[in-house]
Amino acid sequence: MKNWLNSDLKDNDIVITTRIRLARNIKGIPFPDKLSDDEGRDVVKKIKDTLIVSNDGKENFTCIDLWKNDNNCNAEYLEKHLISKKLIENYNRSAFILNKDETISVMVNEEDHLRLQAITAGLNLEEAYECIDRIDDKIEENLDYAFDEKIGYLTACPTNIGTGMRASVMIHLPALSMNNEMPRILNALSQIGITIRGLWGEGSKAIGSLYQISNQITLGMSENDIISNLKTVVEQIINQENLSREQLMKKYKYELEDKIARSLGILKNSVILDSNECLNLISNVRMGVEIGIINDISKKSLNNLLVNTQRATLQEIYNKELSKKEENIKRALYVRENLR
């Protein structure tokens, strides 16, 4: 699988990432929120040892214990979409196991004992599932999962019971956002068991016209059915977005080109940039790349700007704790230097 930060997608590919997560628990052990820190760390060791044995050296895995890191370091992993907010909340007893390419992440003691994640570039639901399913099978050969023959995998939250699978894509929908079509789409999808969230998942706003679209239903459907349904929905949304872009170009060609050019100009010349403004400007430039107005900027560079302009990553890049004002100044500096 391709790392989404290091991959240049096709110009017309508006799906940025595909992610598959599987929720699993070990039979006979209380859910993570019921464990003491010492008990949780015992689970971490158990899963780490199991993954190393089951992996048989095929993947170069590293185990990262969150309790050994500072808050900024853990936040960096969140900004790269390698871990969740819940894993950070449980930092005293949580960890994650990461492969060299940063396409596979096994979170330990999040809401469940295991959250196995595959994340890759573009719309690649089948590839991501095959990859994480293979690792899941290997782990299950050595660990006794909490499983019920009638309903499937048992999870801390009832909404994950069954397959325990969440399939999601991160997609760029600027034209539908500009045309105020997103409320209608959100309402329609909620009626068929699909949910739309912002860039950072549950509870987050859709900044920069970036949305996460995922399945809500995990019970009574097979993994392949979930993937097939989500893929069909995403392809329909892609078609709607492309149609909206065509309409905008026909009706407001010069206004759209001006908006994109001004956004690029601000990014290349600003001295202070807050996070939300930066994401919105990057969105406009990304649209310019996607529709062929801008030809000298890669999607790969824009993907890296998405992550590297976030607070924790900026502090790591400049090796210092930043005040809010300093953060906005350094963000503008970083963008200027990387869009030359």
Curated annotation (Swiss-Prot):
Residues the record lists as binding ATP: 17-21, 81, 115, 166-170, 197-202
Residues annotated as signal peptide: none
GO cellular component term of the entry, any: extracellular space
Broadest EC class assigned to this enzyme: transferase
Keyword ATP-binding included in the entry's annotation: yes
Keywords for the protein's UniProt record, in alphabetical order: ATP-binding, Kinase, Nucleotide-binding, Transferase
ATP-binding found in the keyword field: yes
EC number(s) recorded for this UniProt protein: 2.7.14.1
Ranges of residues in domain Phosphagen kinase C-terminal: 14-244
InterPro entries: Arg_Kinase, ATP-guanido_PTrfase, ATP-guanido_PTrfase_AS, ATP-guanido_PTrfase_cat, Gln_synth/guanido_kin_cat_dom
GO biological process: phosphocreatine biosynthetic process
Summary of the function given for this chain in its UniProt record: Catalyzes the specific phosphorylation of arginine residues in proteins.
Xref: NCBIfam families: PRK01059.1-4 (NF002194)
Protein known as: Protein-arginine kinase
Originating species: Clostridium acetobutylicum (strain ATCC 824 / DSM 792 / JCM 1419 / IAM 19013 / LMG 5710 / NBRC 13948 / NRRL B-527 / VKM B-1787 / 2291 / W)
Lineage: Bacteria, Bacillati, Bacillota, Clostridia, Eubacteriales
Gene: mcsB
